[in-house]
Amino acid sequence: MERSGGNGAGARAGAPSEGAAKGSSLLSAKSTEGATGRFSQSTPRPTGMDGFLKSDERQRLAKERREEREKCLAAREQQILEKQKRAKLQYEKQIEERWRKLEEQRQREDQKRAAVEEKRKQKLREEEERLEAMMRRSLERTQQLELKKKCSWAGSAASGPGGRDGESENTPPLPLTLAASIPPSDTGTATAAAESTNACDKLSTSTMNLPKQTEPPMSKHLSSSIVAISYSPDRALRSPLKSSYKSSPTRTTEKKKNTLLSGVGDAGKGAMTGGEPSQMEKVKKGRGATSVSSGGLGSPLRRCEPPENISKRSSSPVKSKVTAKTYPQSPKTVKPTYIGSPVKYYFPPTPSEETLKKKAEKEKSNKEKEGATGRQTTVLPREETLEKPMADKDATEKYVADKHATEKHSATGGKAEHSAGKSTAGTTDAGEAAKILAEKRRQARLQKEQEEQERLEKEEQERLEKEELKRKAEEERLRIEKQEEEKKQQEEEEKRKAEEKAKEKAEEELLSKEEQEKEKQEKEKKEKAMIEKQIQAEKEAAEAKAQDAAKQMRLEREQIMLQIEQERLERKKRIDEIMKRTRKSDASLEVKKEDPKVEIQPLPDVENKIKPVVPNKIEINVLNTCQKVNVSERAAPETFPQDIFSNGLKPVGGPVHPDVLDGKSNSLDDSTEEVQSMDVSPVSKEELISIPEFSPVSEMIPGMSLDQNGTGNARALQDILDFTGPPAFPKKSSENLSLDDCNKNLIEGFNSPGQETTLNTFC
């Protein structure tokens, strides 16, 4: 700002060099100074530069705002992604928790089911043990009873031995265990036992290839006993879930019973070495015992079988058929039945003569021995003789018994035979011992195979049970999933139905509201129309009433105006008469001297024209009168009150022809103004008296004289005072009153405001 001219020139000279050096950079400070020095020294920076700087600043700020917005958007997207991730994790966690709960619930149900099953099995085992104990007790009782019966039968059998020869031919041979346990008394019996064992060995190897149709003759005889065994209470109380080949607790008890009974049999056999009954007697007694025992097996706890029969209840082909018919199992619990090794059927050999002779000799020798040793025998030999028929009866049932029970019983029988062989030293030879050993080995091998088969079947059964449990669990899981899906679909369907119902309800409410609004609007329109009609009717009635009232008022006003006009005319007439009377005495002489010629326009047919509208027909030519008559100064006040009075009492417009009245009143006003503006010159009394008497009444009724009124001056003044009220000016004495003063008083009295207001009220 303090630069000199040289400095300014130097600055102006240096500006182009700086601009050339920096390439016309408008954003630098030096170029800005050169540009400003070029134009003016007082402005340091042009407005254009400020605009550029502002635009750069705006761009920078806009860029910063964009960057901040992008950062905010990126942060928001990151938050949204994190939220979605958390929601997904939460959802997965909820799903896992739900699956875990379902799995735990399924496990609990499985455990509960297994516990219930185990409890049921335990209860069944306890029930079986209880029933077995009851059966053992009942067996003991029945054995005691049978022993008593057989004791009585033994005496009768000894008296007639020959009658049973025919029956002995049809009796089957003894089984292997029974034949081995009975020591032969002589070589004949030993050979018979050897033959029977050989036959058993042959049959055991050949029965694998036997057809199913080939049944031994004994099967018919044993059908009744088999049916009775199949309906035994022990079999009826078994669980349907147990298969025929499973090892149940009953089999363990059967083994114990077999060992117990084998010991009893061994004791009996040891005591029988001295002498035993013949084979025919045993078969006969066995048949009798079989019939008795089979007859007592109808009810669950009737005559129970001996322990040998209980141990032989297993799944043979014949019994499986009977039980399948008797106890049909459900498809769920049916399991593959185990078909054991075929039963050894013993075909009875045809009796020959040699065997018959041997039997007869054997009977004789037995009788002799019985007679010798009859005294020495005690209760024990009797029990042995009673148990022999029981053993024979059991032998008949062993033909159709299960292989497993037969093997176990044969093993125990082998042990008993071995002990019996030891007790009866020298009763068996080496061949028979070898056969017995071979039979034992074969039975051990079969037992091992049976155990292996049972183990495999047990494993297979366990595997099947596991698969069944898995399948059930999978079905349960699928069922639960299906139920959940159906429940979810049902909830969605219910929700959708509820939404549809709500929507329909809202639409119905909206429609009802719209209908209500329409009805309301229509009702309001109707009410409004009715109100408008009522208002219109009332308005028309009011207008009619107003018109009637206005008409009535107009008529009344017309009547009043007519009355007022008549009164005014009468007053005017009286005033004129009064004025005439007051002037008459003084101006009678002057009037006689001067006979002024006043042109009075007569109004013909005044009587015809004065009807309801009288004031409109009055014509007062005051102006013409004033122009024609040269009045003096004294005469002007006398005529002025007449004009003022006529002007002040002009009628109100209305139905009484207001145009005519206005015209007349205007003419009167003009005349009044002209009268007031005239230069009144003083006149003499003669001239005043010579002014003709003028009044509207005299114009209307020219033939009427003032004296016809019949009223005096006093009465006229009294009437004026009554009408106009008391004067507003001080009353002057008659002594000091001149003619001029009288006229003045009259003018002031009639022009007072009280009079005009009174007159206006009438109008």
UniProtKB/Swiss-Prot annotation:
InterPro entries: MAP7_domain-containing, MAP7_fam. It is found in: Cytoplasm, Cytoskeleton, Microtubule organizing center, Centrosome; Cytoplasm, Cytoskeleton; Cell projection, Axon. GO terms for biological process: axon development; microtubule cytoskeleton organization. Residues 434-575 form a coiled coil. The keyword rRNA processing does not apply. GO terms for cellular component: axon; centrosome; microtubule; microtubule cytoskeleton; midbody. Belongs to the MAP7 family. Microtubule-stabilizing protein involved in the control of cell motility and neurite outgrowth. Acts as a critical cofactor for kinesin transport; in the proximal axon regulates kinesin-1 family members, KIF5A, KIF5B and KIF5C recruitment to microtubules and contributes to kinesin-1-mediated transport in the axons. This is MAP7 domain-containing protein 2. It comes from Rattus norvegicus (Rat). The lineage of its organism: Eukaryota, Metazoa, Chordata, Craniata, Vertebrata. The gene is Map7d2.
